[in-house]
């Protein structure tokens, strides 16, 4: 990563790294190098969950645990993180292996979402919890202003099921079609079948549940519900 690119991505993120190797690692997919971003992603996922949970706790003093959990799930889910990645144009900074490059990995939501988490982890290691918390809250400022408790915070699988039931349609079927990677770091691919849609809706995620949620979200969009 040359100096110009490094300077550009740091400006986009709103943070200047002391240890540039952490930035480089955060942007490196496992297909490109043995020194990839998955451990940083693990760390960043936990930090993000804490920061968002704390923000919701402070902003909504009278909301119960269930609503806060649903709001947090909405804010930290894969497609929300991918939206942030698109806003930062992260795809153009990723270091991918040839296979992922050819298959359009720089546009894949799961890779982009994981990279945002890895960046959070790397910024924490490069600075401290206060700095990374302030940065996350800046990234999420508009989303935190807009979010509110209610049915819209139900997860995609629940919303899809309730929609289909309201139309007296069959419930969706989910099938695992591929599990890639080692046991501690797998990528699941799920097919979701809806009776009124001819093709399968494809979801991916780091767990079966996340992949099913991704597929359900795509089904809701396909059905014109969202």
Curated annotation (Swiss-Prot):
GO biological process, one term: tRNA processing
InterPro entries (UniProt xref): dsRBD_dom, RNase_III, RNase_III_dom, RNase_III_sf
Gene3D superfamilies cross-referenced by the UniProt entry: 3.30.160.20, Ribonuclease III domain
Keywords: Cytoplasm, Endonuclease, Hydrolase, Magnesium, Metal-binding, mRNA processing, Nuclease, RNA-binding, rRNA processing, rRNA-binding, tRNA processing
Residues of the active site: 45, 117
Any Pfam family: dsrm
PROSITE patterns attached to this UniProt entry: DS_RBD, RNASE_3_1, RNASE_3_2
Domain RNase III: 6-128
Cytoplasm found in the keyword field: yes
EC number(s) reported in the record: 3.1.26.3
Residues that hold Mg(2+) according to the record: 41, 114, 117
Annotated CDD domains: DSRM_RNAse_III_family (cd10845), RIBOc (cd00593)
Subcellular localization(s) per the UniProt record: Cytoplasm
Catalytic activity: Endonucleolytic cleavage to 5'-phosphomonoester
GO CC terms: cytoplasm
Keyword Magnesium part of the UniProt annotation: yes
Main location: cytoplasm
Domain DRBM: 155-225
Cofactors named for this entry: Mg(2+)
Function description: Digests double-stranded RNA. Involved in the processing of primary rRNA transcript to yield the immediate precursors to the large and small rRNAs (23S and 16S). Processes some mRNAs, and tRNAs when they are encoded in the rRNA operon. Processes pre-crRNA and tracrRNA of type II CRISPR loci if present in the organism.
Family: Belongs to the ribonuclease III family.
Name used for this protein in its record: Ribonuclease 3
Species assigned in the record: Buchnera aphidicola subsp. Acyrthosiphon pisum (strain APS)
Gene designation per UniProt: rnc
